[in-house]
Regions:
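Feature marks short, surface-exposed loop/turn motifs that line or immediately flank catalytic pockets
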Residues: 18, 52, 84
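Short, Lys/Arg- and Gly-enriched loop/turn segments at beta-strand edges
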Residues: 17-25
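Compact nucleic-acid interaction/catalytic patches
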Residues: 23-24, 30-65
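Short, surface-exposed secondary-structure edge patches
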Residues: 1-3, 19
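C-terminal terminal-subdomain/extension
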Residues: 2, 67-116
C-alpha cells in the first residue's frame, strides 16, 4: 500500500476539536514532504474551505478543475495541523499545478517567518 503524497487532497476527519480549530470531515491537502509521509505515522495538512467569499492573505485560492474538487476552494494555511494518518478517510483530489504548490510553500514560509 502507498502513502499520502505532498499535494494530494484527502477527506479528513478533524473531530474532536477545540475552539476555532477546523471541525468535521473536510478536505485537506498534504503539506509534509514525501520522505516524512512515507516513514512517519503523522502527516501535516492544510484544510480547505469552499467558503470563498473572502480570501485572506494567508490563504491560497484553488480552482476546482485544477485539483479534482467539486467546488472552488481556499487552502487555510493558518490551520496547518499534523495529524495521524488514521484521520485520512479517502483521497479526493491532487494539486499538481506547480504555481499553486509554490504559493502554498510561500505562504507557509511567511506564516512561520521563514521568508527573507
Amino acid at each position: 500500500m502507498g502513502y499520502p503524497k505532498k499535494g494530494e487532497i484527502y477527506l479528513v476527519n478533524f473531530d474532536p476539536t477545540i475552539g476555532h480549530e477546523v471541525k468535521k470531515k473536510i478536505p485537506a491537502v498534504i503539506i509534509s514532504n514525501n520522505i516524512h509521509n512515507q516513514f512517519s505515522p503523522l502527516v501535516t495538512v492544510a484544510p480547505l474551505s469552499s467558503n470563498i467569499n473572502k480570501i485572506y492573505p494567508f490563504e491560497v485560492y484553488v480552482l476546482k478543475e485544477s485539483a479534482g474538487l467539486n467546488e472552488n476552494s481556499k487552502i487555510m494555511i493558518i490551520q496547518l495541523r499534523s495529524i495521524d494518518k488514521k484521520r485520512l478517510i479517502n483521497k479526493i483530489g491532487n494539486i499538481e499545478d506547480k504555481e499553486i504548490i509554490n504559493k502554498i510553500n510561500k505562504m507557509i514560509s511567511e506564516h512561520f517567518g521563514l521568508s527573507s
